[in-house]
Protein backbone atom coordinates (compact mmCIF):
# COMPACT_ATOMS: atom_id res chain seq x y z
CA UNK A 1 0.00 0.00 0.00
CA UNK A 2 1.33 3.42 -0.94
CA UNK A 3 2.22 5.68 2.00
CA UNK A 4 -0.48 8.15 1.05
CA UNK A 5 -3.20 5.59 1.63
CA UNK A 6 -2.68 5.90 5.35
CA UNK A 7 -2.95 9.69 5.43
CA UNK A 8 -5.45 11.26 7.81
CA UNK A 9 -8.70 12.13 6.12
CA UNK A 10 -9.40 8.65 4.80
CA UNK A 11 -12.45 8.60 7.06
CA UNK A 12 -14.79 11.35 8.17
CA UNK A 13 -13.71 12.94 11.45
CA UNK A 14 -16.40 13.84 14.00
CA UNK A 15 -18.38 16.96 13.20
CA UNK A 16 -17.01 18.44 16.41
CA UNK A 17 -13.51 18.49 14.90
CA UNK A 18 -12.48 22.12 14.24
CA UNK A 19 -13.35 23.16 10.73
CA UNK A 20 -15.42 20.08 9.78
CA UNK A 21 -18.87 21.61 10.19
CA UNK A 22 -17.73 24.80 8.47
CA UNK A 23 -16.20 22.80 5.62
CA UNK A 24 -19.35 20.77 5.04
CA UNK A 25 -21.55 23.86 5.19
CA UNK A 26 -19.33 25.68 2.67
CA UNK A 27 -19.23 22.61 0.44
CA UNK A 28 -23.03 22.41 0.43
CA UNK A 29 -23.31 26.09 -0.47
CA UNK A 30 -20.72 25.59 -3.22
CA UNK A 31 -22.69 22.73 -4.78
CA UNK A 32 -25.95 24.70 -4.75
CA UNK A 33 -24.30 27.82 -6.21
CA UNK A 34 -22.44 25.84 -8.89
CA UNK A 35 -25.51 23.89 -9.96
CA UNK A 36 -27.63 27.04 -10.19
CA UNK A 37 -25.01 28.93 -12.17
CA UNK A 38 -24.10 31.60 -9.59
CA UNK A 39 -20.41 31.02 -10.20
CA UNK A 40 -18.97 33.97 -8.28
CA UNK A 41 -20.74 32.77 -5.15
CA UNK A 42 -19.64 29.20 -5.87
CA UNK A 43 -15.99 30.26 -6.02
CA UNK A 44 -16.25 32.01 -2.65
CA UNK A 45 -17.88 29.02 -0.97
CA UNK A 46 -15.37 26.66 -2.56
CA UNK A 47 -12.39 28.65 -1.26
CA UNK A 48 -13.94 28.67 2.22
CA UNK A 49 -14.49 24.90 2.04
CA UNK A 50 -10.90 24.32 0.91
CA UNK A 51 -9.53 26.33 3.82
CA UNK A 52 -11.76 24.51 6.31
CA UNK A 53 -10.92 21.06 4.90
CA UNK A 54 -7.22 21.80 5.31
CA UNK A 55 -7.80 23.02 8.87
CA UNK A 56 -9.67 19.80 9.70
CA UNK A 57 -7.04 17.60 8.06
CA UNK A 58 -9.62 16.21 5.62
CA UNK A 59 -7.30 15.32 2.76
CA UNK A 60 -9.93 13.99 0.36
CA UNK A 61 -12.14 17.03 0.96
CA UNK A 62 -9.29 19.41 0.17
CA UNK A 63 -8.50 17.54 -3.06
CA UNK A 64 -12.12 17.63 -4.19
CA UNK A 65 -12.36 21.32 -3.37
CA UNK A 66 -9.29 22.02 -5.50
CA UNK A 67 -10.78 20.07 -8.42
CA UNK A 68 -14.01 22.05 -8.11
CA UNK A 69 -12.15 25.35 -7.87
CA UNK A 70 -10.08 24.58 -10.98
CA UNK A 71 -13.26 23.76 -12.91
CA UNK A 72 -15.02 26.91 -11.72
CA UNK A 73 -12.12 29.15 -12.72
CA UNK A 74 -11.30 27.36 -15.99
CA UNK A 75 -13.44 29.51 -18.32
CA UNK A 76 -11.89 32.85 -17.33
CA UNK A 77 -8.82 32.63 -15.05
CA UNK A 78 -5.28 33.13 -16.41
CA UNK A 79 -3.70 29.91 -17.63
CA UNK A 80 -0.69 30.23 -15.31
CA UNK A 81 -2.91 30.53 -12.24
CA UNK A 82 -4.96 27.50 -13.25
CA UNK A 83 -1.96 25.30 -14.04
CA UNK A 84 -0.41 26.19 -10.67
CA UNK A 85 -3.63 25.19 -8.89
CA UNK A 86 -3.89 21.93 -10.84
CA UNK A 87 -0.21 21.08 -10.33
CA UNK A 88 -0.52 21.51 -6.57
CA UNK A 89 -3.56 19.24 -6.44
CA UNK A 90 -1.77 16.60 -8.54
CA UNK A 91 1.24 16.72 -6.25
CA UNK A 92 -0.90 16.32 -3.14
CA UNK A 93 -2.79 13.31 -4.52
CA UNK A 94 0.25 11.52 -5.96
CA UNK A 95 0.67 7.95 -4.60
CA UNK A 96 -2.51 8.24 -2.56
CA UNK A 97 -5.93 6.64 -2.71
CA UNK A 98 -7.12 9.85 -4.43
CA UNK A 99 -4.75 9.62 -7.39
CA UNK A 100 -7.41 8.31 -9.80
CA UNK A 101 -9.15 11.68 -9.45
CA UNK A 102 -6.34 13.08 -11.58
CA UNK A 103 -8.77 12.18 -14.39
CA UNK A 104 -10.83 15.23 -13.46
CA UNK A 105 -7.79 17.51 -13.37
CA UNK A 106 -6.64 16.26 -16.78
CA UNK A 107 -10.08 17.05 -18.18
CA UNK A 108 -9.95 20.56 -16.72
CA UNK A 109 -6.51 20.98 -18.29
CA UNK A 110 -8.03 19.86 -21.58
CA UNK A 111 -10.75 22.50 -21.24
CA UNK A 112 -8.08 25.17 -20.71
CA UNK A 113 -6.15 23.93 -23.76
CA UNK A 114 -9.32 24.10 -25.88
CA UNK A 115 -10.02 27.59 -24.55
CA UNK A 116 -6.49 28.69 -25.44
CA UNK A 117 -6.66 27.20 -28.94
CA UNK A 118 -4.35 24.22 -28.31
CA UNK A 119 -6.65 21.54 -29.66
CA UNK A 120 -3.99 18.89 -30.26
CA UNK A 121 -2.75 19.17 -26.68
CA UNK A 122 -6.35 18.98 -25.43
CA UNK A 123 -6.81 15.71 -27.32
CA UNK A 124 -3.69 14.24 -25.69
CA UNK A 125 -4.91 15.26 -22.21
CA UNK A 126 -8.33 13.68 -22.78
CA UNK A 127 -6.72 10.43 -23.95
CA UNK A 128 -4.59 10.38 -20.79
CA UNK A 129 -7.69 10.98 -18.67
CA UNK A 130 -9.50 8.08 -20.34
CA UNK A 131 -6.55 5.78 -19.65
CA UNK A 132 -6.60 6.43 -15.87
CA UNK A 133 -7.57 3.51 -13.61
CA UNK A 134 -9.67 3.10 -11.57
CA UNK A 135 -12.25 5.19 -13.40
CA UNK A 136 -13.21 8.46 -11.73
CA UNK A 137 -16.87 9.26 -11.12
CA UNK A 138 -16.26 12.88 -12.25
CA UNK A 139 -18.14 14.01 -9.16
CA UNK A 140 -16.76 17.53 -8.85
CA UNK A 141 -16.85 18.25 -12.58
CA UNK A 142 -20.51 17.30 -12.65
CA UNK A 143 -21.17 20.12 -10.20
CA UNK A 144 -19.92 22.80 -12.59
CA UNK A 145 -22.08 23.78 -15.58
CA UNK A 146 -20.64 24.02 -19.10
CA UNK A 147 -17.12 22.78 -18.38
CA UNK A 148 -17.75 19.03 -18.52
CA UNK A 149 -20.29 19.16 -21.39
CA UNK A 150 -17.87 21.26 -23.44
CA UNK A 151 -15.00 18.82 -22.86
CA UNK A 152 -17.12 15.80 -23.75
CA UNK A 153 -18.51 17.53 -26.83
CA UNK A 154 -14.96 18.29 -28.00
CA UNK A 155 -13.95 14.66 -27.48
CA UNK A 156 -16.90 13.42 -29.52
CA UNK A 157 -16.16 15.85 -32.36
CA UNK A 158 -12.53 14.71 -32.40
CA UNK A 159 -13.62 11.05 -32.13
CA UNK A 160 -11.66 10.45 -28.94
CA UNK A 161 -12.77 7.52 -26.77
CA UNK A 162 -16.33 7.80 -27.99
CA UNK A 163 -17.53 4.68 -26.15
CA UNK A 164 -16.36 5.90 -22.73
CA UNK A 165 -17.45 9.48 -23.42
CA UNK A 166 -20.96 8.43 -24.39
CA UNK A 167 -21.07 6.11 -21.37
CA UNK A 168 -20.26 9.02 -19.05
CA UNK A 169 -22.92 11.18 -20.69
CA UNK A 170 -25.58 8.50 -20.32
CA UNK A 171 -24.53 7.26 -16.87
CA UNK A 172 -24.44 10.72 -15.32
CA UNK A 173 -27.33 12.21 -17.34
CA UNK A 174 -25.15 15.02 -18.68
CA UNK A 175 -27.14 17.30 -20.95
CA UNK A 176 -25.48 18.66 -24.02
CA UNK A 177 -25.50 22.36 -24.65
CA UNK A 178 -26.96 23.76 -27.85
CA UNK A 179 -23.52 23.39 -29.48
CA UNK A 180 -23.11 19.70 -28.62
CA UNK A 181 -22.36 17.70 -31.78
CA UNK A 182 -24.38 15.12 -33.64
CA UNK A 183 -22.32 12.36 -31.97
CA UNK A 184 -23.78 13.31 -28.57
CA UNK A 185 -26.37 10.71 -27.44
CA UNK A 186 -29.31 13.04 -28.04
CA UNK A 187 -32.75 11.59 -27.25
CA UNK A 188 -34.04 12.91 -30.60
CA UNK A 189 -32.18 13.74 -33.81
CA UNK A 190 -33.92 15.62 -36.61
CA UNK A 191 -32.29 15.58 -40.04
CA UNK A 192 -33.54 17.89 -42.75
CA UNK A 193 -30.51 18.48 -45.00
CA UNK A 194 -30.61 16.19 -48.01
CA UNK A 195 -33.97 14.79 -46.97
CA UNK A 196 -36.05 14.30 -43.84
CA UNK A 197 -35.28 11.75 -41.15
CA UNK A 198 -35.87 11.17 -37.46
CA UNK A 199 -33.87 9.24 -34.89
CA UNK A 200 -34.58 8.33 -31.28
CA UNK A 201 -31.82 7.04 -29.01
CA UNK A 202 -29.52 6.70 -32.04
CA UNK A 203 -31.95 4.49 -33.95
CA UNK A 204 -33.96 5.51 -37.02
CA UNK A 205 -37.56 6.28 -36.17
CA UNK A 206 -39.92 4.45 -38.51
CA UNK A 207 -43.69 4.44 -38.75
CA UNK A 208 -46.04 1.50 -38.84
CA UNK A 209 -48.99 2.05 -41.11
CA UNK A 210 -49.98 5.53 -42.19
CA UNK A 211 -47.30 8.23 -41.97
CA UNK A 212 -48.41 11.05 -39.61
CA UNK A 213 -48.01 13.75 -42.25
CA UNK A 214 -49.50 16.73 -40.43
CA UNK A 215 -47.49 16.29 -37.19
CA UNK A 216 -44.34 15.91 -39.29
CA UNK A 217 -45.22 19.01 -41.29
CA UNK A 218 -45.57 20.84 -37.98
CA UNK A 219 -42.11 19.60 -36.97
CA UNK A 220 -40.59 20.81 -40.24
CA UNK A 221 -42.20 24.22 -39.76
CA UNK A 222 -40.74 24.42 -36.24
CA UNK A 223 -37.29 23.67 -37.66
CA UNK A 224 -37.72 26.58 -40.09
CA UNK A 225 -38.84 28.81 -37.21
CA UNK A 226 -35.61 28.29 -35.27
CA UNK A 227 -34.98 27.68 -31.60
CA UNK A 228 -37.51 30.26 -30.42
CA UNK A 229 -40.37 28.48 -32.15
CA UNK A 230 -43.58 30.14 -33.30
CA UNK A 231 -46.79 31.48 -31.74
CA UNK A 232 -49.63 28.99 -32.11
CA UNK A 233 -51.55 31.59 -34.13
CA UNK A 234 -48.73 31.81 -36.69
CA UNK A 235 -48.59 28.02 -36.96
CA UNK A 236 -52.34 27.92 -37.54
CA UNK A 237 -52.08 30.54 -40.30
CA UNK A 238 -49.30 28.65 -42.09
CA UNK A 239 -50.61 25.08 -41.81
CA UNK A 240 -54.38 25.69 -41.85
CA UNK A 241 -54.82 28.98 -43.74
CA UNK A 242 -58.34 28.15 -44.92
CA UNK A 243 -59.68 26.99 -41.55
CA UNK A 244 -61.61 29.23 -39.15
CA UNK A 245 -59.32 30.71 -36.47
CA UNK A 246 -60.52 28.78 -33.40
CA UNK A 247 -60.66 25.50 -35.29
CA UNK A 248 -57.15 26.10 -36.65
CA UNK A 249 -55.83 26.70 -33.12
CA UNK A 250 -57.46 23.46 -32.01
CA UNK A 251 -55.65 21.76 -34.88
CA UNK A 252 -52.37 23.13 -33.55
CA UNK A 253 -53.03 21.71 -30.07
CA UNK A 254 -54.07 18.36 -31.50
CA UNK A 255 -51.02 18.05 -33.70
CA UNK A 256 -48.61 19.13 -30.97
CA UNK A 257 -50.01 16.22 -28.94
CA UNK A 258 -49.72 13.87 -31.92
CA UNK A 259 -46.15 15.01 -32.63
CA UNK A 260 -45.11 14.29 -29.05
CA UNK A 261 -46.51 10.78 -29.42
CA UNK A 262 -44.63 10.31 -32.69
CA UNK A 263 -41.35 11.34 -31.06
CA UNK A 264 -42.05 9.27 -27.96
CA UNK A 265 -40.87 12.05 -25.62
CA UNK A 266 -43.48 14.55 -24.48
CA UNK A 267 -40.90 17.14 -23.41
CA UNK A 268 -39.27 17.20 -26.87
CA UNK A 269 -41.88 19.74 -28.00
CA UNK A 270 -42.48 22.73 -25.73
CA UNK A 271 -45.79 24.56 -25.64
CA UNK A 272 -46.06 27.50 -23.28
CA UNK A 273 -47.89 30.82 -23.26
CA UNK A 274 -49.22 30.26 -26.75
CA UNK A 275 -45.82 29.45 -28.25
CA UNK A 276 -44.59 26.11 -29.61
CA UNK A 277 -40.93 25.17 -30.00
CA UNK A 278 -38.53 22.25 -30.25
CA UNK A 279 -36.71 21.64 -26.95
CA UNK A 280 -33.01 22.19 -27.71
CA UNK A 281 -31.93 20.21 -24.64
CA UNK A 282 -33.70 17.11 -25.99
CA UNK A 283 -33.35 17.46 -29.74
CA UNK A 284 -30.47 17.90 -32.16
CA UNK A 285 -31.35 19.52 -35.49
CA UNK A 286 -28.84 19.33 -38.35
CA UNK A 287 -29.98 22.61 -39.94
CA UNK A 288 -29.50 24.50 -36.68
CA UNK A 289 -26.07 22.98 -36.11
CA UNK A 290 -25.15 24.07 -39.62
CA UNK A 291 -26.43 27.61 -39.03
CA UNK A 292 -24.35 27.94 -35.85
CA UNK A 293 -21.28 26.77 -37.71
CA UNK A 294 -21.96 29.27 -40.47
CA UNK A 295 -22.40 32.09 -37.94
CA UNK A 296 -19.05 31.26 -36.31
CA UNK A 297 -17.32 31.27 -39.69
CA UNK A 298 -18.32 34.76 -40.76
CA UNK A 299 -15.51 37.25 -41.38
CA UNK A 300 -14.69 38.99 -38.12
CA UNK A 301 -15.75 35.97 -36.06
CA UNK A 302 -13.74 32.78 -35.57
CA UNK A 303 -11.16 32.21 -38.29
CA UNK A 304 -12.62 30.09 -41.06
CA UNK A 305 -10.37 27.20 -42.01
CA UNK A 306 -10.45 23.83 -43.71
CA UNK A 307 -11.89 22.24 -40.58
CA UNK A 308 -14.86 24.59 -40.62
CA UNK A 309 -15.45 23.96 -44.29
CA UNK A 310 -15.24 20.19 -43.86
CA UNK A 311 -17.60 20.25 -40.88
CA UNK A 312 -20.05 22.36 -42.85
CA UNK A 313 -20.08 19.91 -45.75
CA UNK A 314 -20.47 16.97 -43.37
CA UNK A 315 -23.63 18.60 -42.02
CA UNK A 316 -24.91 19.96 -45.32
CA UNK A 317 -25.66 16.64 -47.01
CA UNK A 318 -28.06 18.29 -49.42
CA UNK A 319 -30.65 21.04 -49.65
CA UNK A 320 -33.26 21.51 -46.94
CA UNK A 321 -35.86 18.73 -47.20
CA UNK A 322 -34.21 17.78 -50.51
CA UNK A 323 -36.66 19.98 -52.44
CA UNK A 324 -39.62 17.98 -51.09
CA UNK A 325 -41.11 20.90 -49.19
CA UNK A 326 -42.58 23.47 -51.55
CA UNK A 327 -44.43 25.55 -48.97
CA UNK A 328 -43.33 29.19 -48.92
CA UNK A 329 -41.76 28.85 -45.47
CA UNK A 330 -39.73 25.79 -46.53
CA UNK A 331 -38.54 27.43 -49.75
CA UNK A 332 -37.44 30.57 -47.88
CA UNK A 333 -35.49 28.61 -45.28
CA UNK A 334 -33.91 26.43 -47.98
CA UNK A 335 -32.66 29.54 -49.75
CA UNK A 336 -31.24 30.91 -46.51
CA UNK A 337 -29.27 27.72 -45.88
CA UNK A 338 -28.02 27.60 -49.48
CA UNK A 339 -26.62 31.11 -49.07
CA UNK A 340 -24.95 30.00 -45.84
CA UNK A 341 -23.18 27.03 -47.43
CA UNK A 342 -21.84 29.18 -50.26
CA UNK A 343 -20.63 31.87 -47.85
CA UNK A 344 -19.10 29.38 -45.43
CA UNK A 345 -17.23 27.48 -48.13
CA UNK A 346 -16.01 30.76 -49.62
CA UNK A 347 -14.68 31.91 -46.24
CA UNK A 348 -12.97 28.59 -45.60
CA UNK A 349 -11.57 28.43 -49.13
CA UNK A 350 -10.26 31.99 -48.92
CA UNK A 351 -8.45 31.15 -45.68
CA UNK A 352 -6.85 28.14 -47.36
CA UNK A 353 -5.81 30.16 -50.39
CA UNK A 354 -4.35 32.83 -48.13
CA UNK A 355 -2.18 30.12 -46.59
CA UNK A 356 -1.09 28.87 -50.00
CA UNK A 357 -3.23 25.72 -49.80
CA UNK A 358 -4.87 26.18 -53.18
CA UNK A 359 -5.32 22.46 -53.88
CA UNK A 360 -7.18 21.97 -50.60
CA UNK A 361 -9.32 25.01 -51.40
CA UNK A 362 -10.11 23.64 -54.86
CA UNK A 363 -11.22 20.31 -53.37
CA UNK A 364 -13.46 22.19 -50.94
CA UNK A 365 -15.09 24.14 -53.78
CA UNK A 366 -15.61 20.96 -55.81
CA UNK A 367 -17.29 19.23 -52.87
CA UNK A 368 -19.60 22.19 -52.39
CA UNK A 369 -20.46 22.35 -56.11
CA UNK A 370 -21.39 18.67 -56.00
CA UNK A 371 -24.10 19.71 -53.53
CA UNK A 372 -25.14 22.94 -55.26
CA UNK A 373 -24.23 23.05 -58.94
CA UNK A 374 -25.89 26.46 -59.37
CA UNK A 375 -23.63 28.31 -56.90
CA UNK A 376 -21.96 30.64 -59.39
CA UNK A 377 -19.62 32.29 -56.82
CA UNK A 378 -18.08 28.89 -56.08
CA UNK A 379 -17.38 28.31 -59.78
CA UNK A 380 -15.47 31.60 -59.81
CA UNK A 381 -13.51 30.69 -56.69
CA UNK A 382 -12.60 27.33 -58.20
CA UNK A 383 -11.49 29.04 -61.42
CA UNK A 384 -9.24 31.37 -59.40
CA UNK A 385 -7.73 28.38 -57.58
CA UNK A 386 -6.99 26.51 -60.79
CA UNK A 387 -5.45 29.61 -62.34
CA UNK A 388 -3.15 29.99 -59.32
CA UNK A 389 -2.08 26.38 -59.84
CA UNK A 390 -1.32 27.10 -63.50
CA UNK A 391 -4.21 24.92 -64.69
CA UNK A 392 -5.78 27.43 -67.06
CA UNK A 393 -7.37 24.80 -69.29
CA UNK A 394 -9.09 23.20 -66.29
CA UNK A 395 -10.29 26.62 -65.13
CA UNK A 396 -11.93 27.19 -68.52
CA UNK A 397 -13.60 23.78 -68.29
CA UNK A 398 -15.08 24.88 -64.98
CA UNK A 399 -16.39 28.04 -66.66
CA UNK A 400 -18.05 26.02 -69.42
CA UNK A 401 -19.60 23.75 -66.80
CA UNK A 402 -20.94 26.79 -64.94
CA UNK A 403 -22.34 28.31 -68.15
CA UNK A 404 -24.04 25.05 -69.12
CA UNK A 405 -25.68 24.50 -65.71
CA UNK A 406 -26.97 28.07 -65.45
CA UNK A 407 -28.37 27.89 -68.99
CA UNK A 408 -30.06 24.50 -68.63
CA UNK A 409 -31.55 24.97 -65.17
CA UNK A 410 -32.15 28.71 -64.90
CA UNK A 411 -32.06 29.87 -68.51
CA UNK A 412 -29.50 32.59 -67.77
CA UNK A 413 -25.93 33.50 -68.68
CA UNK A 414 -23.09 33.72 -66.15
CA UNK A 415 -22.67 37.13 -64.54
CA UNK A 416 -20.39 39.76 -66.07
CA UNK A 417 -17.89 39.09 -63.28
CA UNK A 418 -17.67 35.40 -64.17
CA UNK A 419 -17.46 36.15 -67.90
CA UNK A 420 -14.66 38.67 -67.29
CA UNK A 421 -12.71 36.07 -65.30
CA UNK A 422 -13.08 33.59 -68.16
CA UNK A 423 -11.84 36.23 -70.61
CA UNK A 424 -8.64 36.73 -68.59
CA UNK A 425 -8.06 32.98 -68.72
CA UNK A 426 -8.22 33.01 -72.53
CA UNK A 427 -5.67 35.85 -72.86
List each model region and its residues:
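Helix-turn-helix repeat elements of alpha-solenoid scaffolds
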Residues: 1-9, 37-48, 77-88, 124-125, ...
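Amphipathic alpha-helical segments of tetratricopeptide repeats
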Residues: 7-18, 47-58, 87-95, 128-137, ...
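Ankyrin-repeat and related helical/solenoid repeat scaffolds used for protein-protein interactions
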Residues: 64-67, 80-134, 385-387
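Short boundary/linker motifs that mark transitions into or out of structured domains
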Residues: 149, 153-216, 266-277, 318
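Intrinsically disordered, charged and Pro/Gly-enriched terminal/linker segments
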Residues: 59-62, 66, 71, 98-102, ...
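DNA-recognition element of transcription regulators
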Residues: 210-220, 239, 244-264
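Extended amphipathic alpha-helical coiled-coil/heptad-repeat regions
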Residues: 1-9, 13-30
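A structural signal for the main folded, soluble domain(s) of proteins
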Residues: 18, 26-29, 33, 56, ...
Amino acid sequence: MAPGNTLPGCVWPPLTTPGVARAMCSLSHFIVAACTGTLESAVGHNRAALEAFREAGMFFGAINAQIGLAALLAPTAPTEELIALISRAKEEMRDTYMQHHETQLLLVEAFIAIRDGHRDHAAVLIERALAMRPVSDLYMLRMVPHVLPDILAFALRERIGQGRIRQWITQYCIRGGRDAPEQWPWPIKIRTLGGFGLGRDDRPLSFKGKIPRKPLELLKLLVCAGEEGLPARAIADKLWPDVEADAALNNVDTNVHRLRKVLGIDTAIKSSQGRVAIDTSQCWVDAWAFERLAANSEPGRKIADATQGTLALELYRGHFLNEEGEQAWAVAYRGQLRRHIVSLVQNAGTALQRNGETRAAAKLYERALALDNLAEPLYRDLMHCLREQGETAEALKVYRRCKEMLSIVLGIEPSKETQALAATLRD
